[in-house]
Amino acid sequence: MANFVLNAQARAEDKQGKGASRRLRRESLVPAIIYGGNAEPVAVTLELRELVKALESNAFFEEVVEIKVGDKVENVKIQALQRHPAKNTPMHADFKRA
């Protein structure tokens, strides 16, 4: 199936927004969203180290990725990735359901 498997945690409503995202980034976490298909969008948090490791491969941008959110598995493709302008570290990721 997918070569890339990422573990994520769902974010509550109070953990969304500019200030909350900044706090997550200070803890080496990356805010992300999963959308598309018939299901509602899901705000998730990924570990920075795990995402950077996956980004080292160019295939990550072309293949279907599995994201485990709790006990649920989402098959997604990366839609957009925002990086820090100076550090080049991921700041936010958008995933679209496949």
UniProtKB/Swiss-Prot annotation:
MF (Gene Ontology): 5S rRNA binding; structural constituent of ribosome
CDD domains: Ribosomal_L25_TL5_CTC
PANTHER family in alphabetical order: RIBOSOMAL PROTEIN L25/GLN-TRNA SYNTHETASE, ANTI-CODON-BINDING DOMAIN-CONTAINING PROTEIN, RIBOSOMAL PROTEIN L25_GLN-TRNA SYNTHETASE, ANTI-CODON-BINDING DOMAIN-CONTAINING PROTEIN
Lineage: Bacteria, Pseudomonadati, Pseudomonadota, Gammaproteobacteria, Moraxellales
Subunit details: Part of the 50S ribosomal subunit; part of the 5S rRNA/L5/L18/L25 subcomplex. Contacts the 5S rRNA. Binds to the 5S rRNA independently of L5 and L18.
Keyword terms of this UniProt record: Ribonucleoprotein, Ribosomal protein, RNA-binding, rRNA-binding
Family according to the record: Belongs to the bacterial ribosomal protein bL25 family.
Function: This is one of the proteins that binds to the 5S RNA in the ribosome where it forms part of the central protuberance.
A biological-process GO annotation: translation
Keyword RNA-binding among UniProt keywords: yes
Protein name as catalogued: Large ribosomal subunit protein bL25
Species for this entry: Acinetobacter baumannii (strain ATCC 17978 / DSM 105126 / CIP 53.77 / LMG 1025 / NCDC KC755 / 5377)
NCBIfam families membership: PRK05943.1
Sequence segments annotated as region (Disordered): 1-23
Signal sequence interval, chain numbering: none
GO cellular component: cytosolic large ribosomal subunit
HAMAP family assigned: Ribosomal_bL25
